[in-house]
Swiss-Prot record:
An annotated Gene Ontology molecular function: lipid-A-disaccharide synthase activity
Species of the source: Albidiferax ferrireducens (strain ATCC BAA-621 / DSM 15236 / T118)
Stated name of the protein: Lipid-A-disaccharide synthase
GO BP of this protein: lipid A biosynthetic process
NCBIfam families documented for this protein: lpxB
Amino acid sequence: MANQISQHLQVALVAGETSGDLLAGLLLDGLREQWPLMTAVGIGGPQMARRGLVAWWGHDKLSVHGFGWEVLRRYREIVGIRRQLKTRLLRQQPDVFIGVDAPDFNLDLEQDLKAQGIKTVHFVSPSIWAWRPERVEKIRRSVDHVLCIFPFEPALLARHGIAATYVGHPLANVIPMEPDRSAARAALGLADGDQVVAILPGSRQSEINHLALRFFQAAALINKAHPAIKFIVPAIPALRAGIEHAARASGMQAHLQIIAGQSHTVLAACDVTLIASGTATLEAALFKRPMVIAYRMGWLSWQIMRRKQLQPWVGLPNILCQDFVVPELLQDAATAQALADAVLLWIDAKASHPAKIAALQQKFTALHTELQRDTPRLAAHAIQQVLQG
């Protein structure tokens, strides 16, 4: 029982990105319910701060993606943060360390902490089923337990001797089963009859650098075919300058409604989204929206990634449905024309092939149901078992 563990539970967490900050915030809700006097320290963002995290560094310090020069440029700073964090945690001796995603940073840290007797939990299984299967050995050495957000993962990890629990995907509870498109449009000043394309070029600066201009060039081509279409772009403050720069470079700034955050409102309001591969694609699927998934990265990162990829899909909706239910355009294939053509197919399907859109929505509804669990409670219970073990 929770009361057998000190009510003054000391938890350390690291979340390295916006998506991890959201997941960790929900996890803290579950922990706080069991241990109201809990204290939490580490690395995180605003969602974690709202739940009482004392942030030693902001999560933006770890928000870097790729394998090549994108990582090498920040390597020294990130290694320095990890070294300082390890020293502080070994001095403080928290009851449990929870690494939220960010496996490149967290697994090494977890391995060091576990070796010194600190309980370690990893929230969001590294995608050994998609690529980098060699990582399974490091996971086994580094963590006491993995909290999985996809239902097939615990059995896969168990085959490698790793304890794991399926806790559902928190977003499946945050996003309503039947999103209110009209309310979302009203909130954004859009009419029910408008045709709306949401453009989400990523949550990292490197993604904005590689995708935003290309996405807005595609929007220009779509605008030529359908001048009445509304384009909505949610932008978090840290990325807004880069997004606005790309908008000006594309000549589309007058046609793009760039708004502060509100990505969920934007996805609820849209008819179709042009979207960077990542967690946002799962959000779009849970909103039951047709999408075109794209990704571009540095040449070296791409060469490494394509050699390690184990599945034919990159986008989470396609991976989870085990089929190309929505198009993916990657690297050199993600031209402005190809992106525009793929979006226009969805726009035209609304009138010409409504059954195609209905079938997609049915698949996404089934996926939503499968992922919907009481994640904060299940995760807190699993952590409780680790603490008692």
